[in-house]
Amino acid sequence: MKKAVILFNLGGPDSLNAVRPFLFNLFYDRRIINLPNPFRFLLAKFISAKRENTARKIYEEIGGKSPILENTKMQANASELKLNENRNHVHKVFICMRYWRPFADEVIESVKQFDPDEVILLPLYPQYSTTTTLSSIENWQKNAKRYGLKCNTKMIHRYYDNQDFIEAHTNLIAKYYKLARKIGKPRVLFSAHSLPLSIIKKGDPYASQVERSVELIVEKLAINNLDWSICYQSKIGPVKWLEPSTESELLRAKADGVPVVLSPISFVSEHSETLVELDIEYKAIIKDGYYFRVPTLSTDPLFIKCLADLCINLP
């Protein structure tokens, strides 16, 4: 049996000229801004124009483009190798980005050429949110219908409590905790992408799933009297978002004079929000030598095993 696995990710501009259209696509998503047209279109145009210069400066810090596609390609290659250890089926992994290339319509044409017996949708979002997982799935389904991809399709919605996912995080955090311990008693900050409270109040389970991921990791770390906190980054705009902010927790750690071990708990690949926000902007808050940023899971063997097993064990 031939199986196509579709890895969903956010996407990112592949040049500085792509920054504004990328931002427009992001803010035009009705799962991000829930307004009817033409209001959503006009607001997306306004926000993307207003934020373009700020965003361009961010991408200039990391070579003029987002590394998310290259990172996702490495994850796709590693996952495909792992999946094809199972000789009963032939797996091919495709990358589908939500807000920049490759878009769903391009990927669907490639999938049709592969002609699979089954399609598996696998978001690179461990914790489910309507703004990420659901948005990607709905966009895929709409394009699959439009471009005539008729195939048995299965979906993976979440894996925030997957044993291998938890263990992969635990191992990385333990390594950096040991380094930080040489300075003093570290505080572990679990930094997740923030969401507006209005979305959470509508029943989005993202925050509760982030909390459960962290609970399981803390339990697995089994460090006596571990000092830890969940915090949220990347807020934009004036509305209320999930709190506390990562910045405020770093300022608190600075005031307390403790080393910080920061784990990007909701990110599985490196991009602007880790490489610039965490590694440059937030790092500058903490005293030199007191900041230990844990890498994203990327192609960690346990994480790749997690992704492969999710596909293999689907009913």
Swiss-Prot record:
<keyword id="KW-0627">Porphyrin biosynthesis</keyword>
<feature type="binding site">
    <location>
        <position position="273"/>
    </location>
    <ligand>
        <name>Fe cation</name>
    </ligand>
</feature>
<dbReference type="InterPro" id="IPR001015">
    <property type="entry name" value="Ferrochelatase"/>
</dbReference>
<comment type="function">
    <text>Catalyzes the ferrous insertion into protoporphyrin IX.</text>
</comment>
<dbReference type="InterPro" id="IPR033644">
    <property type="entry name" value="Ferrochelatase_C"/>
</dbReference>
<dbReference type="InterPro" id="IPR019772">
    <property type="entry name" value="Ferrochelatase_AS"/>
</dbReference>
<keyword id="KW-0350">Heme biosynthesis</keyword>
<dbReference type="GO" id="GO:0006783">
    <property type="term" value="P:heme biosynthetic process"/>
</dbReference>
<keyword id="KW-0408">Iron</keyword>
<keyword id="KW-0963">Cytoplasm</keyword>
<comment type="pathway">
    <text>Porphyrin-containing compound metabolism; protoheme biosynthesis; protoheme from protoporphyrin-IX: step 1/1.</text>
</comment>
<dbReference type="GO" id="GO:0005737">
    <property type="term" value="C:cytoplasm"/>
</dbReference>
<feature type="binding site">
    <location>
        <position position="193"/>
    </location>
    <ligand>
        <name>Fe cation</name>
    </ligand>
</feature>
<protein>
    <recommendedName>
        <fullName>Ferrochelatase</fullName>
        <ecNumber>4.98.1.1</ecNumber>
    </recommendedName>
</protein>
<dbReference type="Pfam" id="PF00762">
    <property type="entry name" value="Ferrochelatase"/>
</dbReference>
<dbReference type="GO" id="GO:0004325">
    <property type="term" value="F:ferrochelatase activity"/>
</dbReference>
<comment type="similarity">
    <text>Belongs to the ferrochelatase family.</text>
</comment>
<keyword id="KW-0456">Lyase</keyword>
<dbReference type="GO" id="GO:0046872">
    <property type="term" value="F:metal ion binding"/>
</dbReference>
<dbReference type="InterPro" id="IPR033659">
    <property type="entry name" value="Ferrochelatase_N"/>
</dbReference>
<keyword id="KW-0479">Metal-binding</keyword>
